[in-house]
Amino acid sequence: MCDDEVAALVVDNGSGMCKAGFAGDDAPRAVFPSIVGRPRHQGVMVGMGQKDSYVGDEAQSKRGILTLKYPIEHGIITNWDDMEKIWHHTFYNELRVAPEEHPVLLTEAPLNPKANREKMTQIMFETFNAPAMYVAIQAVLSLYASGRTTGIVLDSGDGVSHTVPIYEGYALPHAILRLDLAGRDLTDYLMKILTERGYSFTTTAEREIVRDIKEKLCYVALDFEQEMATAAASTSLEKSYELPDGQVITIGNERFRCPESLFQPSFLGMESCGIHETVYNSIMKCDVDIRKDLYANIVMSGGTTMYPGIADRMQKEITALAPSTIKIKIIAPPERKYSVWIGGSILASLSTFQQMWISKQEYDESGPGIVHRKCF
């Protein structure tokens, strides 16, 4: 970017984490939990500067005395007041910028309701007075980040997973599939199976501990049955984890039983297909001529695709479903946790993109509906 141009802000609002930074950077400056916390108790000490709400890391660190809420559920914003708090926190506390001076690129879940995009647009222009904004689909940005224009993206975050086939830069909406199974469900499942082991995790604060156990110790088995047998026969797969109070817990087959539910949702009592079948079904909804290109470009993105072993297992499962002659390639870049944000950073700094922004002037003339004409 040249210096006389002002850098655009890129904000990827995930159900679990908000990623924010400046277009042209190679990684987000700020990554914090999409959480708003409110005190459960009455403040008694005067002059402590107690607030009526806390956002992000501060809410996380004071979680013992707060009730934590996530304003984004299953990838879709459900609580606009809290969402506004998160955006305010993003601009003023994390990035320390004045939003009225920068174009803002926001991301949205595939198949986001139309009213939601309008509301996002309205808040950006009316509450934050942004000079320009744009809303991009998360999975499309992940594909940009991998340097492709054609492929199928499996984007699995904290609140929702999607398979989005994209051909020459266009998402194919009729073939997008959504799976309400993602990181948060896996955390809840891990809480459940650890409870069966005799460890009790119940509160919203303890759930965050379990999330940490999941991120540090879980992995995907290449062959689940065989791994279960190994775990039963020896202690080679056991790992220990120290809780904040110093208590040490041991976790064995839970390490791979938890993420196995991505491939077998029946573990969670869900009747849906696993992520491998969902990818396959999504490809099968596309035109027969482009399937070959999709099989050869299966791109993983989002935090829930970070488990060790997930790409190999995916390769194995898709190979079993697809025609035998077809070449299957799984792309799982190491930075895939942030690939939506990175794609946004790339897009917002392209010279060809500059005419795509919705300007404040266009918004004032046409109203929130402008977002459907300019962002597709």
Curated annotation (Swiss-Prot):
**What CDD domains does its record include?**
ASKHA_NBD_actin
Species source reads Drosophila melanogaster (Fruit fly)
SMART domains named in the record: ACTIN
Q: How is it modified after translation?
A: N-terminal cleavage of acetylated cysteine of immature actin by ACTMAP.
This one is known as Actin-87E
Q: Which reaction does it catalyse?
A: ATP + H2O = ADP + phosphate + H(+)
The entry's function note states: Actins are highly conserved proteins that are involved in various types of cell motility and are ubiquitously expressed in all eukaryotic cells. Multiple isoforms are involved in various cellular functions such as cytoskeleton structure, cell mobility, chromosome movement and muscle contraction.
| Gene Ontology cellular component list | actin cytoskeleton; cytoplasm; NuA4 histone acetyltransferase complex
Annotated EC: 3.6.4.-
Q: Where in the cell is it found?
A: Cytoplasm, Cytoskeleton
Q: What is its main location?
A: cytoplasm
Task: Provide the GO MF annotations for this entry.
Answer: ATP binding; hydrolase activity
Q: Which residues carry this modification: N-acetylaspartate?
A: 3
SUPFAM superfamilies assigned to the protein according to its UniProt record, in alphabetical order: Actin-like ATPase domain
Q: Which UniProt keywords apply?
A: Acetylation, ATP-binding, Cytoplasm, Cytoskeleton, Hydrolase, Methylation, Nucleotide-binding, Oxidation
Further information in the entry reads: In Drosophila there are 6 closely related actin genes.
Gene Ontology biological process terms from the UniProt entry: DNA repair-dependent chromatin remodeling; mitotic cytokinesis; ovarian fusome organization
Residue positions assigned to the propeptide:
1-2
State the family it belongs to.
Answer: Belongs to the actin family.
Q: Does the keyword Nuclease apply?
A: no
The protein's enzyme class = hydrolase
What PANTHER family does the database record attribute to this sequence? ACTIN (PTHR11937)
- A Pfam family found in this protein is Actin
